[in-house]
Structures are given as structure tokens and as C-alpha cells.
Amino acid sequence: MRRFSVFLVVFVVAASFACGGSPSNPSGTGTLNVRLTDSPFSDAGAVLVTFRGVRAHRSESDWAPVPFADTTAVTRTCDLKKLENGAVDILGSGPLVTGHYTMIRLVVESAKIYQAKSPAGPACASSITIAGEEGINVQIPSGEVKLNRGFTLEADATTTIELDFDGDRSIRETGNGVYTMNPVIAILSVTPSTPPQP
């Protein structure tokens, strides 16, 4: 009788694996795009801001990194002057586990102000160089910015978040040619896409 019971248990377990197939990820992944634009800023030819990281906070979980658009780069630099008047560029984009997210966190590593304009090309890149001018380093007391805005990432769907980096309110001249930055960034919109129908 005992041997029959053991056999029955083994048979039931084996049958459940056969019916269920291989284990699958119950949550899946979706894609998060983080785009950047800038309010008008008129006191410079170029304002290069370098980001060290973009992260999203998942409910009841931890911070998840959002890859930069250039996935091989550890930083991403954007010229705020090229992001004025409705222009946008991708800051980060990549797959994240599905679920409800509560916050976006940005880390601004450095910033420089130039009188000359940056060369032709995209507003954001892994690096941007302006030849013939050293630029003015901007002091950043705290480069970490947390943005509270909930959104839900669905499986096989894309959610796009558009951020406004207000350069005019972020940068202040304190005298003697010294500039400081306290990043003022707001979420303009969160646009989810509909996942494909089976």
C-alpha cells in the first residue's frame, strides 16, 4: 500500500510537469523609454549635462536600471540647447520587469556651459565635444533627482515617459563667473502603449 502511495505521488508530480511544460516567467517584461526635452534657456550657446544613471522604482521591489540609449555607455550627455522648443531625444530605453512603478530617479554627474554652439548632430550622445572652448564647469551640490509618478508597465508593451529639464530654473550664477545647478526636472507625460493581442 505504501509503495502504491509513493508511486501515485511521483506520477502526479510528473504529470503536472508534463502538462505545464517548462516554467515560464509569470511577470514578463515591457519596454520603458525615457525621453528628454528642455524649457527655453537663452544664456549660453550650449549646456552639456552628463547623466550617470536612470532608474525606475518598482512597487514592493528595488530600483531597476534603465539602460542608456547607447547601451554600451556608462554616461549620456545631452545639450539642453538642442532640446528647446519641443525637441526631444532619448535618454534611456530598455526592458524592465512588468508591474507598477512609483518613481524615476536620475543622477546628474556634471554640467558645462559654453558660449559656442555644439556641433551638428543629435542632442544626446555618449559624449559631446565642443572644440576650441573649455567651457565653464557648473557646480552641482546634489545631482540626484527623484520624480514621483506612478505608471504600470505591461508585458510586451512600451511605456514612454517625457521629462522636462528646466535649464533656466536649474542654473544660477552666484557671482565671479561661478555657476551652480540644482536640477529642476518634471514629468511632462506618461504614455503607455497597448500590448499586442494574442
What function would you assign to each model-found segment?
Residues A15-A18:
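C-terminal motif of bacterial Sec signal peptides marking the signal peptidase cleavage site
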